[in-house]
From Swiss-Prot:
It comes from Chlamydia muridarum (strain MoPn / Nigg). This is Ribonucleoside-diphosphate reductase subunit alpha. The record marks C1043, C1046 as: Interacts with thioredoxin/glutaredoxin. The active site is at N670, C672, E674. The lineage of its organism: Bacteria, Pseudomonadati, Chlamydiota, Chlamydiia, Chlamydiales. Tetramer of two alpha and two beta subunits. The record marks D465, R495 as: Allosteric effector binding. Its EC number is 1.17.4.1. The record marks C458, C687 as: Important for hydrogen atom transfer. Provides the precursors necessary for DNA synthesis. Catalyzes the biosynthesis of deoxyribonucleotides from the corresponding ribonucleotides. Substrate binds at T442, S457, C458, G486, N670, L671, C672, T673, E674, P857, T858, A859, T860, I861.
């Protein structure tokens, strides 16, 4: 049934004439296309399903046409064919759509070769095909504007437009016949104006002139007004699409695209600048992907000048994601509906894309689709989207299947699989994740909702002094690494070089060759093809092979006794530091001669160690080595500075303060030194990580405690769910995780939070903020675990734990003080909150998780959500970060905001930052109070970083990935730094940072202004006499920019 509104519609033909709209023409065109593609003869009836499809598509196109005409838009034959094409794709009829496109292209080529084809000479000298429809459209617009017409165009106007168009086209044809079928665009515009005035439409002529001057374009119906004045510099390039077809792109078209990407930042970004930069890299036949890349690179190049360009680049990359996953662009009107429909189709077809098959049956997909907030896609900066695109989005044969919100929802669904009300909790989890309040660790993001849901971050295992077990652990490493886990191995039990092997009566080669095999296994097995596998090997400092162990990462020496790819860490008992203080000796043993020593700690370790030393003196133990503690310490520090390894971790505080001291011993930490759990031959310790984003919980006057409480409650629930959903590559890992249910809740964006509060990291205020924020996180994490225990029950090994004995993390400091003595422990023990309600909850309900808190490095997830890593100070205010997704310029957005307010952010300031390697201290025009707030990592005295870490450690039941910074070689300062870390009660340390592998590009620094003679200058110049004194070059740690496994 054709309604009255449809009968009143008219469209513009290719000759520029208005004609009545006829839906039958659409039906007939579709029928012809179906018959041609499906090889159905004209005399044969169409199958019922095909006829229904044609009617449905016709109805959708008619509905869209009528709506646009009702809205006052001009609809052309070409636009209707675009709609038909779009509907064929939406309805999954790609084969018909493809043939229809080919048919249209053939017809277009035929028209352009016809006698009616005329050429228009543009101002830039290029020619384009003359299109009468554009004259009709421009005339109608002018009449509508003059007569203030709303809704459909009246018949008398259409008749006048048709008559005028015929006269204009006739005159153009007449002139072209005298000018070799070509006419200048100025002549066309003159003819239009002349004809309007000849017939007496003076007001319309005036509006048309204004219309031309304003260079208006009819964007809504995708018609470029050929009569509108063209820019003299307009260039055109042919672009090659992925499917092999080509199209033309102009400077103004690219400007329109980039203007949309810049529209959120009109005051700080310049679309014209980006257009010029991108267009300068174009060439005829440029690939479509290269067009996008040129635009993104133009935006990237300006990030150092204006951080908002990071969001412009992100929006451009988002368009790539949308086209790849949804076959849509960001500006498409139907994007939102296609987005939601694609999500539901993606989940329903998930079996083909490695998704967990349960997802499609256990959730209300309509509710989940409607819960997605697409505007949250715009929260990401460029580096965040690039990381997601490269490594996190699920893909099929190189094509991304996910967008940011679909990615978050897939993760949320995977974490809600064991909930009773799955849809409710999936939406709750999604809202927390997609607003950047909390982010799970990378393995969870990789694998949640997938068929193999290995979601755990960290695995800790101990190697027995047995060949079968040695290779079993190496094999386990491969399996764990395959599914994106980071691994810590304890190798202390392996007998030392020269020890007797009773079975063969031979001598052992020691632990080093086995670590070499471990190294090569880590290299061979990458993490699901997404990032490098990674292992950290631990050795206690009394092991006879320890001195060789120190040199594993050296670049010189016998390469058969080097392990360049694994990380190494020293497991140091307190007794070693006591001997160091006493300037005493230290004895190295083979583990098979000192049974029980590795499992002992505190006073028991001291008793056993001294007993074994007496056996050395009596001759009972013959394989040993005595060294001066100071000499060994000096070698430890030397290797740490030269190679960045072995990291220093502390055995006694890790065990004495462990909540699980009743079930075993902590023998090592994990890959990133924040996890401290028992492991044994029968148990591989497992921990699941996630981090709270402090930035999202900052108010003007401090932390939003209510919001933080809610975030932590939901986050702990997610982390606990991981344990039950997880895919376990080994039996030992599964048994340990189910028995103890350890989770590691951490933080990120600590430095950003300080910036928002105008606090310097090197201040007592920062120390107090570290203390208070950690206390709140500890308080609400313990509370959440208690409430989960009430709902789900305690973990199975709860009985006898410190929790069960009424000891909270804050209480265990006294246990450590009792063993060490007050001179060797300098930890604050003050509290702000009333902890009695938490103690009461534990007594009543117990705990769901044996351990709760650990601060991971968050190297990758902090990049995704755009905050500073973990608890790290700002590295530099302008630097280049390298990871598997490439190199990214990282400016300090908080600093730039401050400098803008002071009116001193300009090209010279950027030049200064580059010249001074991202530091403010030597830039005279920066006020001192700004310099103090914005100290970089190497400018902050280590005491501040260590005191902040100590305040956190009093509340944390595990550890923290704590990097330390040393700007210049200074053995005494380095020694004091690590001795202070021990005395402050820290359990572990992480990297020692001495310098960076990547720096900011300085090729544009003004050497004349700096007064420096470049090396290539052969002749003596006025600047040749300048003496530039530079600090001696420090050794460069062969470190990566950040941990790429835990987070």
């Amino acid at each position: 049934m054709v309604d009255l509104q449809e009968k009143q519609c008219t469209i513009v033909k290719r000759n520029g004439m208005f004609v009545p709209f006829d839906r039958n023409r659409i039906f007939q065109a579709l029928e012809a296309a179906f018959r041609d593609t499906r090889r159905i003869d004209d005399h044969m009836p169409l199958p019922e399903d095909l006829e229904n499809s044609i009617r449905s598509i016709t109805h959708q196109v008619v509905k869209e046409v009528v709506q646009k005409i009702t809205d006052g838009q001009v609809v052309t034959v070409e636009r209707i064919q675009d709609m038909v094409e779009s509907q064929l794709y939406i309805n999954g009829l790609q084969d018909v759509a493809r043939d229809y496109v080919v048919y249209r292209d053939d017809r277009k080529a035929h028209r352009e070769k016809s006698w009616q084809s005329l050429s228009v000479i543009r101002r830039c000298g290029t020619t384009v095909h003359f299109n009468p429809m554009k004259i009709s459209a421009a005339l109608e617009k002018a009449f509508r504007a003059t007569d203030r017409i709303e809704g459909m165009t009246p018949d008398f106007v259409r008749e006048e437009v048709n008559a005028l168009t015929q006269k204009i086209v006739a005159e153009i044809e007449e002139r072209c016949s005298q000018q070799d079928s070509r006419i200048d665009i100025e002549q066309i515009q003159d003819i239009v104006e002349q004809q309007l005035m000849v017939v007496g439409h003076y007001a319309t002529a005036k509006n048309y002139i204004l219309y031309r001057e304003a260079r208006a374009r009819v964007r809504d119906n995708r018609v470029e007004d050929q009569i509108v004045e063209e820019a003299p510099s307009e260039e055109t390039f042919e672009v090659l699409s992925k499917d092999g077809s080509t199209y033309m792109i102009t400077h103004s078209q690219l400007l329109a695209r980039l203007a949309r990407a810049c529209s959120r930042f009109p005051e700080t970004t310049d679309a014209a600048l980006l257009t010029d930069m991108a267009f300068s890299n174009f060439y005829s036949g440029i690939k479509e992907s290269e067009v996008v890349l040129a635009c993104i690179m133009a935006a990237r190049a300006n990030i150092e000048k204006e951080p908002d360009y990071a969001f412009v680049a992100a929006e451009l990359l988002l368009d790539v994601v949308y086209k790849e996953a949804l076959d849509r662009s960001r500006g498409d009107e139907d994007l939102e509906q296609v987005y939601r429909d694609h999500f539901k189709r993606y989940i329903m077809e998930g079996d083909s894309y490695r998704l967990n098959p349960e997802l499609k049956n256990l959730f209300d997909l309509d509710a989940l689709a409607n819960a997605m907030d697409l505007s949250r896609d715009l929260q990401f900066s460029y580096m965040g989207i690039q990381n997601l695109y490269d490594r996190y989005f699920n893909h099929d044969d190189g094509r991304r299947l996910e967008t940011p919100q679909i990615f978050w929802m897939r993760v949320a669904m995977g974490l809600a699989l064991k909930e009773q009300d799955k849809t409710y909790w999936a939406i709750t989890f999604y809202n927390l994740l997609s607003t950047f309040r909390y982010t799970p660790a990378t393995p969870t993001l990789f694998n949640s909702g997938m068929r193999h849901s290995q979601l755990s971050s960290c695995y800790l295992s101990t190697v027995q002094d047995d060949l079968v077990n040695i290779y079993k652990v190496i094999s386990d490493n491969a399996m764990l690494s395959k599914w994106a886990g980071g691994i810590g191995n304890d190798w202390t039990a392996i007998r030392a070089t020269g020890a007797l092997i009773k079975g063969t009566n031979g001598k052992s080669q020691g632990v080093i060759p086995f670590i070499k095999v471990t190294n090569d296994t880590a290299v061979a097995v990458n993490q699901g093809g997404k990032r490098k596998g990674a292992v950290c090997v631990y050795l206690e400092v009394w092991h006879l092979d320890y001195e060789d162990f120190l040199e594993l990462r050296k670049n010189t020496g016998d390469d058969r006794r080097r392990a360049h790819d694994v990380n190494t860490a020293s497991w140091i008992p307190d007794l070693f530091f006591k001997r160091l203080q006493q300037k005493g000796s230290w004895t190295l043993f083979s583990p098979d001669d000192v049974p029980g020593l590795h499992d002992a700690y505190g006073e028991e370790f001291e008793r056993l160690y001294e007993e074994y030393e007496r056996k050395v003196d009596s001759g009972e133990i013959r394989l040993y080595k005595k060294v001066e503690a100071e000499d060994l310490w000096r070698k430890m520090l030397s290797m740490l500075f030269e190679t960045g390894h072995p990291w220093m971790t502390f055995k006694d505080p890790s065990n004495i303060r462990s909540a699980q001291d009743h079930t075993g011993v902590v023998r090592c930490s994990n890959l990133c030194t924040e996890i401290l759990l028992n492991c044994s031959e029968t148990e591989t310790a497992v921990c699941n990580l996630g981090s709270v984003n402090l930035v999202q919980h900052i108010l003007d006057d401090g932390l939003d405690e209510e919001k933080l409480s809610e975030t932590i409650s939901i986050a702990v629930r997610m982390l606990d769910n991981v344990i039950d959903i997880n895919f376990y590559p080994t039996k030992e890992a599964k048994e340990a995780n189910f028995a103890h249910r350890a989770i590691g809740l951490g933080v990120m964006g600590f430095q950003d939070a300080l910036y928002k509060l105008d606090i310097s990291y090197a201040s007592q205020e920062a120390v107090e903020f570290a203390d208070y924020s950690s206390e709140l996180i500890s308080y609400y994490a313990i509370q959440a675990s208690c409430l989960l225990a009430k709902e789900r029950g305690t973990y199975s090994s709860y009985k006898g734990s410190k929790w069960d004995r009424g000891l909270l993390p804050i209480d265990t400091i006294q246990l450590l003080a009792n063993y060490r003595g007050k001179d060797n422990l300098q930890m604050d023990t003050s509290v702000r909150k009333d902890w009695e309600p938490i103690r009461s909850l534990i007594r009543e309900h117990g705990m769901r998780n044996c351990q709760l808190m650990a601060i991971a490095p968050t190297a990758t997830i902090s990049n995704i959500i755009g905050v500073t890593q973990s608890i790290e100070p700002t590295y530099k205010h302008l630097f280049v970060k390298s990871n598997l997704s490439g190199e990214f310029t990282i400016p300090n957005v908080y600093l730039i905001e401050k400098l803008k307010k002071l009116g001193i952010w300009d090209a010279d300031m950027l030049d200064d930052l580059k010249y001074f390697d991202g530091s403010l201290l030597e830039i005279e025009r920066v006020p001192d109070h700004i310099k103090h707030i914005f100290l970089t990592a190497f400018e902050i005295e280590p005491e501040w970083i260590l005191e902040c870490a100590s305040r956190r450690q009093k509340w944390i039941d595990m550890g923290q990935s704590l990097n330390l910074y040393l700007a210049q070689p200074d053995g005494k300062k380095l020694s004091n730094m690590y001795l202070t870390a021990w005395k402050k009660g820290l359990k572990t340390t992480y990297y020692l940072r001495s310098s960076s592998a990547t720096t900011v590009e300085k090729s544009f620094v003004d050497i004349n202004k700096r007064g420096i003679q470049p090396r290539w200058m052969k002749n003596k110049s006025a600047s040749a006499g300048i003496v530039v004194e530079r600090a001696s070059k420090t050794p460069v740690c062969s470190l990566e920019e950040g941990c790429e496994v835990c987070q």
